Swiss-Prot record:
<dbReference type="InterPro" id="IPR029054">
    <property type="entry name" value="dUTPase-like"/>
</dbReference>
<dbReference type="InterPro" id="IPR008181">
    <property type="entry name" value="dUTPase"/>
</dbReference>
<dbReference type="InterPro" id="IPR036157">
    <property type="entry name" value="dUTPase-like_sf"/>
</dbReference>
<dbReference type="GO" id="GO:0046081">
    <property type="term" value="P:dUTP catabolic process"/>
</dbReference>
<feature type="binding site">
    <location>
        <position position="82"/>
    </location>
    <ligand>
        <name>substrate</name>
    </ligand>
</feature>
<comment type="function">
    <text>This enzyme is involved in nucleotide metabolism: it produces dUMP, the immediate precursor of thymidine nucleotides and it decreases the intracellular concentration of dUTP so that uracil cannot be incorporated into DNA.</text>
</comment>
<keyword id="KW-0460">Magnesium</keyword>
<keyword id="KW-0546">Nucleotide metabolism</keyword>
<keyword id="KW-0479">Metal-binding</keyword>
<feature type="binding site">
    <location>
        <begin position="69"/>
        <end position="71"/>
    </location>
    <ligand>
        <name>substrate</name>
    </ligand>
</feature>
<dbReference type="GO" id="GO:0006226">
    <property type="term" value="P:dUMP biosynthetic process"/>
</dbReference>
<comment type="similarity">
    <text>Belongs to the dUTPase family.</text>
</comment>
<feature type="binding site">
    <location>
        <position position="96"/>
    </location>
    <ligand>
        <name>substrate</name>
    </ligand>
</feature>
<dbReference type="InterPro" id="IPR033704">
    <property type="entry name" value="dUTPase_trimeric"/>
</dbReference>
<dbReference type="GO" id="GO:0004170">
    <property type="term" value="F:dUTP diphosphatase activity"/>
</dbReference>
<comment type="pathway">
    <text>Pyrimidine metabolism; dUMP biosynthesis; dUMP from dCTP (dUTP route): step 2/2.</text>
</comment>
<feature type="binding site">
    <location>
        <begin position="86"/>
        <end position="88"/>
    </location>
    <ligand>
        <name>substrate</name>
    </ligand>
</feature>
């Protein structure tokens, strides 16, 4: 699959690397904080960060997901403000990353720092069918915590 992209910040692909897969087994392309200067997030702060690029998936069978980088969350409490960003196949605007400092210490993001990852996933649009009832299943209406702790 080829993913169309546009560079919106001239530093991207010049002094700051374009997104790429770190290894042959990597699922996500690293997205970078294309801020103009270091940005300090105080505990509890959220900030919408530009990535300097836009994409066009151009296939309704796929979508993009912006996911956090595990090290930033575990070591520093830096996570996505919206937990997961969903990029529809027909979206063509700049990719933005909602960054939230849920940690106890201020954290400074440097220009070009990797802040999230983009994963392309298959999706299916469904046709809704209204029914009066469902055929019985083993789980039924059991919800949160229904299967217990094992």
């Amino acid at each position: 699959m080829r993913l169309q992209y546009r560079v919106l910040d001239t530093r991207l692909g010049d002094s700051i690397p374009l997104p790429h897969y770190a290894t042959d087994g990597s699922a996500g392309l690293d997205l970078r904080a294309m801020v103009k200067e270091p940005l300090t997030l105080q505990p509890g702060d959220t900030e919408l960060l530009p990535t300097g690029m836009s994409i066009f998936i151009d296939d309704p069978g796929y979508a993009g997901m912006i996911l956090p980088r595990s090290g930033l969350g575990h070591k520093h409490g830096i996570v996505l403000g919206n937990l997961v960003g969903l990029i529809d196949s027909d979206y063509q605007g700049e990719l933005m990353v909602s960054c939230w400092n849920r940690g106890q210490q201020p954290f400074t993001l440097e220009p070009g720092e990797r802040v999230a990852q983009l994963v392309i996933v298959p999706v299916m649009q469904v046709e809704l069918k209204q029914v009066e009832s469902f055929s019985a299943s083993k789980r039924g209406e059991g919800g949160f915590g229904h299967s217990g702790r094992q």
